[in-house]
Amino acid sequence: MEKKLRTASICVQGGYQPKNGERIEVPIIQSTTFKYDNSEEKAMLFDLKKEGYFYTRLQNPTNDAVAQKIAQLEGGVGAVLTSSGQAANFYAVFNICEAGDHIVTSNEIYGGTFNLFGVTLKKLGIECTFVNPNDSEEEIQKAFRPNTKVVFGETISNPGCAVLDIEKFARIAHKNGVPLIVDNTFATPINCRPFEWGADIVTHSTTKYMDGTASQVGGVVVDSGNFDWMANAEKFPGLCTPDDSYHGLTYVKAFGKMGYTTKLVAQLMRDLGSIPAPMNSFILNLGLQSLHLRMRQHCENAQKVAEFLHNDPRVAWVHYSGLKDDTYYELAQKYMPNGTCGVIAFGLRGDRETAIKFMDSLDMINIVTHVADARTCVLHPASHTHRQLTDEQLKEAGVAPDLIRLSVGIEDVEDILDDIKQALDKI
C-alpha cells in the first residue's frame, strides 16, 4: 500500500499501518526499555542480528513510525529522528567524517550550522571550507582536498532565501566521490525532493514546517540509499571497514542500502544519544498530517506579501524566489515549480535601527527565535540568530546588517498585510 500512496496520503497515513483492532493514531510508546522472554533473543538484538527494540536511546516504535513517514515523503530508504535539527546536521556529517577529514559547504546556510561546521567540527579535527553556491563548478572544485568527505547545502537558505542548484552540487560531489547532504527544512518534501535531483542524504529541522505549531524540537536524517559507499571505500572507513565495537561488523556489507542509517543508530545514538522523546515524535506526526495543506497556504500568503513589499518604496530590497525578478527565480521554477516556502528576506531603506523599529512596531506578527510556523514570525538575524558572527562572517554567510527575516504564516493574508503596513507607517 505504501508505494501507491501519493504525497498527501503519506502525510496522513504513511509510516504506520494499524492492524485489526489497533488504535488508528501512532501510539506513544513512552518507555525506556522493552521486555524479552530469554537472554539469547536480547543478545541477538545487541549484535544487530535481529530487528527489534531494547532501549529508547537507540530506537523506539513511535520514533521509527514517524521517521518512516518522513522517509516515504522524501523518497528515501530509511530515516532517523533526532532531538533537534542541529543534531540532525551534526549526525549526518559525523556519521561519515572523523578527525583529519574535510567538508565543503555552501556559505548560504543557517547561522547555527555555520558555527557547527566552522567552529565545533574544527575542535573535533574536521576542517570545513565555505563556498559561494553561485560560483561556477570549476571555482567550487578548487575547495576540494584529497580528504574531503562531504558536500553540504540548504535547499532554501536560512535566512537569505538563496536557492541551491542541487544538480550542480550533486555533480561536483559525485565527481569527487563524496555524497551531497541537503538540508531541506524550508522547502519540505511537499515542494522539493532533493533525492530526485541527485542529493544523497537529506536533513530537516522538524521543529519548523513539519511540526508547524512550535510545540516540539526535533530533526531527522534521511538516506536515499543511492550513494555507493564501497565504490570509494577508502574514503569511508567507518561504513566500509569492520567496526570493532560490533565484533568486526561492516555496516555497508551487512546492511546494504540501510548501512548508513544503521550505523547512525547503532554507533552514534549508542555513544552520543540525541534521540527525541516519543511524545515529541507523536506531536510531530500530528503536524505532518496537515503539512501538504499548510505549505500551500504558506506559499500563497508569502507570494502576496513579497509582492507588496517589492512594490513599497520604503522597502530597499526583497529576496523571495517566487518574484520573477528574483536572482533565484529560475532555480526555484526548476526545483520547486509549485511553490518554495513562506520565508521572505527583505531590507528597509534606512539603517539597522530602522529594521528594529519596524519589528518593534508590529502587533500581530511575533518577534520570536523561530521560523516556518503557522503563525507569522519576524526576526533580525544580525541581532539574534547570527549575533555571534563577526561582520566579516555575516557577509560570508550572506546576512546583510539590514536583513529582516519574515516567516509568513497561514493566517488571513489581509491581516498580515495590515500589520506590516501599520508598522511601516511608524518608521
Residue ranges and their predicted role:
Residues 75, 147, 314-317, 364, ...:
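Glycine-centered tight turns that cap/initiate beta-strands
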Residues 38-90, 112-120:
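Conserved N-terminal alpha-helix of the aminotransferase class I/II PLP-enzyme fold
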Residues 222, 345-347, 407-409:
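Short hydrophobic/aromatic beta-strand micro-patches
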Residues 2-60, 68:
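N-terminal "arm"/small-domain region of PLP-dependent enzymes with the aminotransferase-like
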Residues 33, 223-227, 348-351:
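Short loop segments at secondary-structure junctions
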